[in-house]
Amino acid sequence: MGFRLLCCVAFCLLGAGPVDSGVTQTPKHLITATGQRVTLRCSPRSGDLSVYWYQQSLDQGLQFLIHYYNGEERAKGNILERFSAQQFPDLHSELNLSSLELGDSALYFCASSV
C-alpha cells in the first residue's frame, strides 16, 4: 500500500517578487505524507507587530486563517481544528498543521504589518 503524498507549498506573500519585503517564511516548499504534522514559520519585517496567515487551495481565493498582534490572537477566520498558530515574544509566528489530509494541499501565506 503506497503513501499518498500531500503537497504543502509555502511561499512568502510579500517576498515572492524581486522587492525585499523583509518577511521571511520557511520552509518555502514542502512535500509530506498524509497524517503527518508540519510547522510553517513566519518572521515579520523589523518593527511589524502583526502577523497574518492565509491559505489558498486550488481553484479558490485566499482564505484568512488567523491574525496575531504583539503576541495576542486578534482575529480568527476559517481555520481548521487540526491547525493551530501562535506568535512568540520575538514576534515570529508559527502555523502548525497536524493530521494532514489530501485536502490540505494549498499555498500557505504569511504577511506582516505595523
UniProtKB/Swiss-Prot annotation:
Name of the protein in question: T cell receptor beta variable 9
InterPro entries: Ig-like_dom, Ig-like_dom_sf, Ig-like_fold, Ig_V-set, TCR_beta_variable
Domain of life according to the entry: Eukaryota
Signal peptide: 1-21
Disulfide bond recorded as keyword: yes
Keyword match Ubl conjugation: no
Main function: V region of the variable domain of T cell receptor (TR) beta chain that participates in the antigen recognition. Alpha-beta T cell receptors are antigen specific receptors which are essential to the immune response and are present on the cell surface of T lymphocytes. Recognize peptide-major histocompatibility (MH) (pMH) complexes that are displayed by antigen presenting cells (APC), a prerequisite for efficient T cell adaptive immunity against pathogens.
Subcellular location: Cell membrane
Disulfide-bond pairs as recorded: 42-110
Subunit record text: Alpha-beta TR is a heterodimer composed of an alpha and beta chain; disulfide-linked. The alpha-beta TR is associated with the transmembrane signaling CD3 coreceptor proteins to form the TR-CD3 (TcR or TCR). The assembly of alpha-beta TR heterodimers with CD3 occurs in the endoplasmic reticulum where a single alpha-beta TR heterodimer associates with one CD3D-CD3E heterodimer, one CD3G-CD3E heterodimer and one CD247 homodimer forming a stable octameric structure. CD3D-CD3E and CD3G-CD3E heterodimers preferentially associate with TR alpha and TR beta chains, respectively.
Gene Ontology biological process: adaptive immune response; cell surface receptor signaling pathway
Residue positions with a glycan: 96
Main subcellular location: membrane
Residue span, Ig-like domain: 22-114
GO cellular component, one term: T cell receptor complex
